[in-house]
Amino acid sequence: MSVFLRGVLLFLSLLGTGGHSLASADFPWQKIDEGLEYKSVRVDGLPYQTLMKLTILRIGWEQFQVRILDSRDHGVGRMEIKALTRKAQALAGINGGFFLPGYRPLGLLIVDGKEANPLRKADWGIFLVQDNLPRIIHTTEYQNGRNISQALQVGPRLVVNGRELQMKKQIARRTALGLTLKNQVILLTTEDTDVYAQDLAHIFHLPEARGGLECRDAMALDGGPSTQMYAEYKDLKIDIPGGWGVPNGVGVFKRR
């Protein structure tokens, strides 16, 4: 078979599968520890609108926990995620919610059971840990009850109950959080690439067999210059800096 014919057949096969079927095989998960996996993904071509370079952590809830990090707990209004992660003695961290001028948090924050910032009436999502289980809900579903140890309000939501939502046509650097069907937590940042929110929703929604993250629910966190990720644990080292410090983030801790 000629090189030209092989190229034509490969092109047709990619069109027939939506252009993303190779992602799962080409970018396998790397096991860092029991319950902690990492992968770096580069996706280009249909059905995505732009090149995406993604850094992703998948966190098993039985072995690890996720907690909200607040810079004010360390005496400052903002910190780079690298510094905040280290200060909190987390093994990994990403940036969190929106903020006002002066780096004042915008939206609900609950840190280790204490409300650090009030709920905002907005069409956003809330990541929370209630009764030691992770959830993503809409603002209107929130009830200030007991047994909520962590909460972060931000948005928009990308996937709801396994359904990909329609996003505004906006492009930026992105940070996002998702929950898989197995209650694993996904932490994702883009690296050196601007991404459409719809493409991000699509990859969170798609099954793993088609190169996706197979999430039941997912939401965007603050993006643009706020986007950043840091991890230092065993053989894993990630350092994706942002454009400025942030008031809060999401940290990963090993259960004892």
Regions found by a protein language model. Give the residues of each.
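Zymogen propeptides
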Residues: 20-118, 136-137
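Positively charged n-region of N-terminal signal peptides that target proteins for export
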Residues: 1-7
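Conserved, well-ordered active-site substructure
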Residues: 103-121, 167-174, 179-221, 225-256
